[in-house]
């Protein structure tokens, strides 16, 4: 199902179980910007309180711009990770309001353990991750998102940027199995048709 931003800036309602921000005037402004730039949302969000969202291809800083505009326009409270140092200055307040989670990279316990603990402590959490881990072309995805989803026992929701059609596509839910390599191959196959700003996934 395709959802185009309407002339009045409207977007489809989110499912009840999905984490959401309270209503805010900024949502309409972001929806207007998306409409003016021709971007649209394809697919539907599952009615689940906890999952891992993966976004690809990630080939430009513009991905963050369009993703953030869509997130705010929808009122979707999708969390994301950032290094703890970014939260110490004046930017920290804004990052937290937008769903940022400070990460202790030097902590004794690893990133996966930090996020699994966050899932176990949160009745509602959608965690967004770019599996490529960089805007540069990579031959292999980082597998942290898969390990987080497996350990937290939550599904994976693929989201794909396609610049030629200016769409953000929400894919079908993916249940991680015990086979990391097979799962990564299946997920990358989903992303094969989509084209980022500078390359495919």
Predicted regions span which residues?
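Extreme N-terminal tail/first-helix region
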Residues: 2-42
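Soluble catalytic domains of membrane acyltransferases
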Residues: 19, 35-193, 198-201
